[in-house]
Amino acid sequence: MKKFTKVLAVLLAVAVFATAFAACSKNGSTSSKVKVIDIALSDEEYAFGVDKNQPELKQQVNDFVAEIKSNGKLDEICNKYFADGTPEGITSATQDPSKDQLVVATNAEFAPFEYKQGDQFFGIDMEIANLLAQKLNKELVIVDMAFDAVLLSVQQGKADIGMAGLTVTEKRAQQVDFSDSYYSASQKLIVKEDDTTFDNCKTKEDVDAILKGFDSSTTIGGQNGTTGQFYVEGSDDFGFDKLNATWKGYANGSLAVQDLINGGVNYVIIDAAPAAAIANSINAVA
């Protein structure tokens, strides 16, 4: 896992370079609209949430995660999104109780882990789901829903597994059985390109000190139900103290960043990989 985490850290560093450079550079002009403050605000582990009534499936998932880590397949998939690989579109079958299917609950608004283009699903989690279904000799069904509904869907037996960039917490583990971790993640801050508030920050503590100094007149946005919300509102489960800033939730991170540009919020906090993907996408058309 340590080697795997280092590989992903390098790949993610490449992915965020363009936005991080804009945050550090003091020379030259830029047409960028936003920048990512390249300081991790949390340390998290992503895992898949399995139906508690299917212990055999959990073991199969754990075996599969170990396999794709050891044979390099997981690195290969990540390279498609963090480096120079070509993402593969995944087509979902129609759900049919009479068939032997693997039903995956996701929220396809969390690139590069899950997103849609037309009728196809893309992303790290979706490509893993496709390989998992093949390994289990099952037909893959992907059900797209609000992030808040993913674990509930699994808990209620409407889906076999949740694959949606899920951070492992004790509270969430009451709803599902988490697989072994497959990805190490963190939260990062997105600001307007011309915002210099955090330019001199070197550590998480530096960023935290500024964030904790804001009052309710400062609004921080992000995706509903994700770690960013708990970072702002506080959570014993995540170990976050409440900020005095006001939280504003959105269906996805892209909407939050767009509202940042439009002046609807002062800052955005979301997971590092989606932060990089969104910032790069928006700045590419700035």
Give residue ranges: language-model regions.
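Periplasmic-binding protein-like
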Residues: 31-58, 108, 183-191, 272, ...
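Extracytoplasmic small-molecule ligand-binding "clamshell" domains
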Residues: 46, 56-76, 80-84, 96-166, ...
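A ligand-binding cleft/hinge motif common to bilobed small-molecule-binding domains
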Residues: 28-42, 148-152, 164-175, 231-234, ...
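Bilobed "Venus flytrap"/periplasmic-binding protein-like clamshell domains
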Residues: 108-111, 121-134, 184-253, 272-274
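Beta->alpha turn/N-cap motifs
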Residues: 29, 106-110, 143-148, 157-170, ...
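Ligand-binding clefts/hinges and TM-proximal coupling segments of bilobed small-molecule sensing domains
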Residues: 36-42, 62-99, 205-217, 221-247
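Acidic, polar ligand-binding/catalytic clefts
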Residues: 33-42, 134, 139-209
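Sec-dependent signal peptide cleavage junction
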Residues: 18-32
